[in-house]
A protein has these predicted regions:
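Active-site anion-handling motifs in enzyme catalytic cores
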Residues: 1-177
């Protein structure tokens, strides 16, 4: 909302949102923004990945043979800081795990895995652990029953923040410390 106001787009976005007959959202922050713009409370829906039992009912997830123990780093390129990358590399070394990067090339990764959405789930299923800073990385960890850490960041200036969406997800799933 703050950035829309900064760029003088809040009125335009608000008017466009009011033209919809219905709006649904996945998190409280998005819901608050929609309500501020439209005066209407949106419908809250689960992410589609949580509405289907992919791991037990989908025959498109391949069996991937793991030749080594690994943790998945699921993050877009450029979002893992050097300090975080160093910490992840040291953590993996202590646990005797390789770091497989999915979603983007990472400084600390032993291997970048370029794969289909169904293969992503196969890699998650076989991982020892997951470190992510994404909404879907957290969800994939939950549906594959993998231990995971979600890196949460505040929006500062023009930098990407995931705090609102991820904090809401983890609170709704009762997965906060």
């Amino acid at each position: 909302l703050e950035k829309l106001e900064k760029y003088q787009k809040a009125g335009e976005v608000g008017n466009l949102l009011k033209e919809f007959d219905a709006i649904s959202v996945r998190d409280a922050n998005s819901g608050s923004i929609v309500e501020q713009f439209t005066g209407e409370e949106p419908v809250y829906n689960l992410d589609p990945v949580l509405t289907y039992d992919y791991m037990n009912c989908c025959d498109r997830i391949p069996q991937i043979e793991a030749t080594e123990k690994y943790l998945i780093l699921y993050a877009y390129a450029g979002r893992i800081s050097n300090e975080e990358a160093d910490w992840i590399a040291e953590y993996a070394k202590k646990k005797n795990l390789k770091v497989y990067a999915i979603g983007g090339i990472q400084k600390c990764a032993d291997r970048f895995v370029d794969c289909s959405p169904f293969e992503v789930l196969a890699y998650f299923r076989n991982a020892e652990e997951v470190i992510t800073d994404t909404f879907h990385g957290s969800i994939f960890s939950v549906i594959t029953h993998r231990p995971f850490t979600t890196l949460i960041r505040k929006s500062v200036g023009n930098s990407y923040g995931n705090e609102e969406k991820l904090s809401d997800l983890l609170n709704r799933l009762v997965l906060t410390e």
